[in-house]
Amino acid sequence: MINIKVEDYDYIMTFTSHNRASYIYQHLFRKNIQVKLVSSPNKINISCTQAVKFKEMDKDVVQQELKKNNMYPTAVYRIVRKGKNENYELVE
């Protein structure tokens, strides 16, 4: 039996375009910040197909990098897990 480790992320941020999400993902990834580029859940964003997930421990660094790169997410949500389902609480 193969055990697959699933990484838990604490936040998800959405952007106005796929290019912005991809750009900030690549930038944060190169800085060794644990991020994941994912499809935007329909529950929170229908205008862009991509979103970036990140961990609580990286929140301050992510915010600093967004400001340094003049990137502003459409919204940031806290991921709330209930069993296998994810719900989202608007943070900013």
Region locations from a protein language model:
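Short secondary-structure transition/capping segments
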Residues: 6, 48-51, 86-89
